From Swiss-Prot:
Protein name: Ribonuclease HII
Species of origin: Rickettsia canadensis (strain McKiel)
The protein's role, per its UniProt record: Endonuclease that specifically degrades the RNA of RNA-DNA hybrids.
Entries under NCBIfam families matching the protein: PRK00015.1-1, PRK00015.1-3
Entry cofactors: Mn(2+); Mg(2+)
Record key words, sorted: Cytoplasm, Endonuclease, Hydrolase, Manganese, Metal-binding, Nuclease
SUPFAM superfamilies xrefs: Ribonuclease H-like (SSF53098)
Subcellular location: Cytoplasm
Amino acid sequence: MEIDLLQYEKKYQEYIVAGIDEAGRGPLAGPVVASAVVIDNTNIITGIKDSKKLSKRKRELLYEQITSNYIWSTAIISHTEIDEINILEATKKACSIAAANLTIKPEIVLVDGNMQFNDKRFVSIIKGDNLSLSIAAASIVAKITRDRLMLDLSTEFPQYLWYKNSGYGTKEHIQAINTHGLSPYHRKSFRYSCFI
């Protein structure tokens, strides 16, 4: 049975709906990125789904289509701010900023996951990137944005292979930390003792 990715957009069809997703909650290095997307119900782009279920090439193509055809915004919270306020609060802050930065004010904000927000417009949907087209589109924009940021940082610190692992705790990344220590972009709040 195929899931209707517009089920939530249809449920709230009388409202301006934005979908939000984040990229970068789990990595050892780099920022967390949240993106918000307001889809145009008269111009549905085919092929949009959870960014993790798409090839890199397909994600790139859809990113270009989404950012060319829909209203969108992105918010980036640095690794240092993550260390100051914790990853959950940093993610929530990024989501709130992404919604606020849209050029149109959403009346309903669909957010992937189970985070709770004080703003009553925010509706958290577990596995939302598999259930809402808006959230799936936002997942693509967030992932591509963060991957590009990590690619840029990788030129400064190639030994951590961020161009390949995006800062996640892969075996090679952990070996690089053991060999070279932490870079200025590593999250100091992460418990590295389990790796080293």
